[in-house]
Amino acid sequence: MPSRVNAMILAKNDTARDYLGIHPNLDLALERINDAFFATLGTERVDIIPGQCWCTKFTYDTIPDEESFFEAHEKFLDIHIMLSGSERVEVSSPKALTVFRSEPENDFWGYQGEGRVKLTLSPGEFLCVWPDDAHKIKMMVDHPETVTKAVFKIKVR
């Protein structure tokens, strides 16, 4: 098992099971990071345990950096899995950013600022961001492209 807990995870899909045991709700998602599960996803949210763990598939066009913003959560972590296309992502501590929107009832906070970690998420990879990881997603790599991604929402607090 990895020695770091509650830290951003960027890994290949075929290593997802290496992270089992960190949190029981996280295990429910990690066990489903595979092509067989992704093939069952339509456009509707799939509840694994209602209110605790679910997955939704999204298709959208990536956007310029300046049109994106950071988001963070207090109770839920996200796992972003690229199914087709690539997008740029930035991650930062919410403490290093400026909050511009607060929706506690939806476990959502929007932020502006500079990312500390910058990466490209491509098919075959997943990014797990914890409540302490503000994440800026949907950014184009070189030009706008249509991407498809699965996102797990997992209650950890």
Where would I find each of the regions flagged by the language model?
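A short hydrophobic beta-strand segment most commonly corresponding to one strand
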Residues: 79, 126-128, 144-157
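Glycine- and acidic-residue-biased ligand/ion/polar-headgroup-sensing regions
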Residues: 75-77, 81-87, 95-96, 104-109
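Short, structured patches in soluble enzyme cores that scaffold and shape functional sites
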Residues: 59, 131-133, 139-141, 153-156
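A short, N-terminal "cap"/entry segment at the start of jelly-roll beta-barrel domains
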Residues: 2-56, 67-72
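Conserved metal-binding segment of the jelly-roll/cupin
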Residues: 112, 120-139
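An anionic, turn-rich surface loop/hairpin at beta-sheet edges
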Residues: 100-119
